[in-house]
């Protein structure tokens, strides 16, 4: 997972909602899930089942595959605190993982080319080792 969202709880996505001109959590969740989420679904809490289906951190279990993570510390699109939900889920379920931080990168990992090279090399090792 490279710069990808770990969870889609709408409260965490205010910047993206603003950028995409989404006025409500229902609009955001409808866009992310492909399901027509209404304000009533949100108020009832039923929206959680849809968020559960698309949020990597919520899908992790003891049978999850080893995971390689990389996040840019200057990412303006994916809230960086979300990575902790995924890391915690992996640790709580005993899933092997490696984590890379790209200190100079935003959503694309092109400002830390040495780190990107290490990440890509390890991704090939993951393919050989686990798949």
Predicted regions mapped to residue ranges:
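Catalytic metal-binding/acid-base residues of hydrolase active sites
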Residues: 5, 74-75, 106
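Conserved alpha/beta-hydrolase "acid-adjacent" motif
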Residues: 76-85
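Short beta-strand/loop motif that positions the catalytic acidic residue
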Residues: 63, 68-71, 75
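Active-site nucleophile loop of the alpha/beta-hydrolase fold
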Residues: 1-9
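C-terminal catalytic histidine-bearing segment of alpha/beta-hydrolase fold enzymes
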Residues: 68-70, 84-131
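Conserved serine/cysteine hydrolase catalytic core
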Residues: 56-64, 81
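Mobile cap/lid helix-loop segments that gate and shape the active-site cleft of serine hydrolases
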Residues: 12-59
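Short, solvent-exposed loop/turn and secondary-structure capping segments
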Residues: 10-14, 80-81
